Every structure is written in structure tokens, then in C-alpha cells.
Amino acid sequence: LPDEVPPQVVITPHAGELASLLTARGEDVDASDVQNEPLHWALRAHELTGATVLLKGAVTIVVGEPADTDRESDAQGGFADDEQHVRVVVSGRAPAWLGTAGAGDVLAGMLGALLAQQDDEDVSAPDVAACAAYLHGYAAAQASQSDQRGFTPPTIYGSDDRHLRTKLGHPIVASDVIGMIPATFAELLS
């Protein structure tokens, strides 16, 4: 990865890969540091590279510049390093079964396809990356027949909508996720 890239470049590391990238840029960090403070290190990677960062994990974190950010005028106004100009999106839809060989390649393919369909000027790489992460996780949930998620909504006292039992589902391989992509799109668009 070059020293600095435009925000339309999306990197999709897991904790170990992000730690390696950051270490190569002079940060003293390892995979456990990234797992313990994923938002901090995703923000740091975005700051150091300029790339949109999609940090894969039980809860996927996407960090990048919104499409309406104008770096040049922001820098003149003193906002170049202002965190309010960074978009953070979190997706926890994926089941644990998604942690399988080749699943990251499926995500990269989905992400590339979605980015390729965007206007160059209006693309919000963080939004597109978050959309890809959600679709990827949802397709995996469908393929594994699982209700698992990276986070669970809180149980509200007195509510009938309790999340005490979830279907664990079954193991999947990357091609199972690929097979569910058309049905996932169809369901979400219906």
C-alpha cells in the first residue's frame, strides 16, 4: 500500500493484518491491541493511509471520509484532522460461521462490484463498504441458517421481544455465501 491513497481505496484487514500494516508505519501495535480497541486502530489506519478501512471481525467497523468531505477547503478552515469529518459505520450482522477460509475474498468481490457501480464524484466509500459488509454477513446468516450476530440487542424489561434463544446454524464455506448472494439481494429489495 502506498504511503497515502484516496478515500475511495478500501482496505479490508482483519486484526492481524491491520496490526501488520500499522507496525510497518511505525505504530507499536499487535493483533490483540487491535481486537481490544478496534475503533481506535481503524481510525488510526485511516488517518495514516487516507484509505477507507473495513476492519473485519465479530463486529465489522468501517471508517472513512464521507463523500461530501472537501479536504482542501477543510484544511484551509483548520478541520483537516477533525474527527467529525470521519464517517464510522458498524455492522454486526454476521454469524461466527463466516470466519472461514475465502470469506474475505467473497467480501472483497462484493465490495468491488458495489464500488464499480458508483459515480466517481458521489461515491461514499464508507457507506458502500458498510453495505457490502452487511450484505456479506446477511448472506452468511442465510447460508448457515443462523441467527447469531456480533452483538445482541439489549433485552428490555417487560418486552415480549426477547433474544434469549438464537439458532446457531451450521458451518459454511465461502461458496455457500456466494450461493446466497442473489437470494439475499432479492429479499432485501422486496
What are these language model-derived features?
Residues 138-190:
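Charged C-terminal helix
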Residues 38-46, 122-140, 174-182:
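Short, well-structured alpha-helical segments that form the helix of a local strand-helix-strand
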Residues 65-66, 85, 90-91, 107-123, ...:
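C-terminal amphipathic "assembly/sorting" segment characterized by alternating charged
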